[in-house]
Amino acid sequence: MGIHATWISHLLFADDSMIFMQANKRSADRLACILDTYHRGSGQLVNRQKSAVFFSTNTGPEMKQMVQLSLGIEKEALGEKYLGLPTAVGRVADGTFDYSADRIRNFIHGWGANNLSYAGRELLLKANAQAVPTYPMSCFKLPAPVCKKMKSHISNYWWGSSVDSNKIHWQRWSKLTTPKGEGGMGFRDLPLFNEAMLGKQGWRLITRPDSLCARVLKGKYYPNGDFLSATRKKKSSETWRAILHGRKVLQKGIIKRVGPGDTINIWNDNWIPGIRSMKPLVHLENSLVQHVDELFLPGTRTWDEDLVRQSFIPSDANEILKIRPGLRMDEDTLAWSHEKFGMYTVRSAYRLLKEEQIQLEASKLNEPNSSDGSWIWKRLWKLKIPPKIRIFWWRVVHNFLPTKMELHRRHVEPEATCYTCGAAIECLFHIVFECPVARMFWDEVKKLTGIKIPKLHQATWVKDLLTGDHCSVSSAELIICGVWSLWTGRNARKHGKVEWRSAAAARHISSMLEDFIGSGTDTSSRQEVTRVRWSGPPSGWMKVNTDAAFSLSNSTGSTGAVLRDHSGSVRAAAARFYPCVSDALMAEALAVRDGLILAAEQEATRVVLETDNATVATLVRSDDGFRSVIAGVWHEIRELSLSFASFICTHVNQEGNEAAHLCARRPSASSPVMSWVGDLPNWLMEVANKDCNVESY
């Protein structure tokens, strides 16, 4: 595999074997002898008709023939696939991965779903078509023409219900791949998804350096360095080129968690989570520090606040002081900054790449920030109406309906008068409110449901229905369903398919909406709320409840912890104020640490820890918290938990954590440390007495 690389003689997967050897007669004869010995000893015979030989490009035809004769294998591995991927990929050329685009095309043809609604098409495209290239994308960088073909097939089917459709594409593909909450449909941008998938391979090289793959690639491409600084050589394999392509997204999101700080270069490494670039924004000329450990007080891992403020601009200094260096960390740790757990995920990497693309396109086209109108889309996708009508309203908000006015503007229709009445320009507002057919329909709706159409302005009516200012949400949902019914009726009349009747249409949308709501699609309103109360630990155990308060405006936090026995009797309680905290999750982690310190001080041996933060509870129970956003505190929590004879961590709703909740709101900058042992304040006694009549578990 390379001068410095690990030697590989064979690879085994299930009942398949891949054997590596030099292309010469001596090696071939020796392998044939080994296979024969195996056959005589085990009774199992290699099926040479199903076997194949792959030769490197510098193997001559005579040597190929000699090796094949010695092994008794006639077939040469040319274009063979194993587990769905080409067994050997040299330079990826046009045609190597065309099968992915062909499979998507065949999928769409096989559905035979020309009459599917947009909701049905969305489901099939996301669940099936987009999943086709996922496996090859995890190993190779697919050529741009292949991605373009796949995009074309998906886009054609979306807008025209056929892979060969040439209907109007009302929105460019990059907008369709925008998240639903920002006005798109959330389809995958395939090249970006490909890069995010390949980033996962690079992450494995970083986090699993002892794996066979990592050792082979290191020996061949970066024997004296590390993956993040490795370069691409002229004769690099397609696999290595693909992994380096995925490394780009890794370099955008990798951060170093501060432990000793001696390996973190202040100005070149990513290490400040509160700054978008993860590096100091400004390099002051008078700053002489180079590594993070130089910013600590001598002999500690506590920030030298004066030095930090002298070395950085105020905004950078404030973010640095929020970082809590790991007192128990042996080394600075690489982590993925876009996940709380610090582990790379394809989802978060894709989201990062997509956000960058959206911002870049918006700056080029001088478009407003898509998040400015995000409330519209959030309300739209929360409407309790059938999915096909939600997507219909998405088209309405974007003005994607082929009304005669719009088609005339695009020079598709010669004139723009209404198909039904012929008396006015056919815009959507006319179709659903002004046309005589529409007026009859709304009269029937009023008779049936009692809902009256509010006064709506033609320029803003689409968004007005989503604001809730002109009518209730339930009325707006019925009106939107009515608009959909009028539009489908207009299309039916245009194509002469059915005779559309106002009364029947009104009854249909009313019953459809009732059936949808009653079908159990939305169960949140019917869920019974069960009040959670504090429960005591088993006899002989102690339970410590923890909670935290966090102020986003001034980045301060406070913690509270209450230690009780199985009867509910409070043994001790404590609270502490922290003047510089990065976020609410860090405050909750500090509360857990303080709670365990309290339990240790009271000489508890069997401890149940209870917190109302599910993320912190999961991290405390996990062995992978060393990369998380609370990495420094996580190591302290882990060390404290191991000091007890028995330790359990559980999550509880806030209602069952009232005592700790009240404690966390007591300390302040003027009274930063508070503790109670024996003589408890009245407010804490009230909560304890209310909780103490519960049974232990």
Language-model features: locations:
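A helix-boundary/hinge signal
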Residues: 1-697
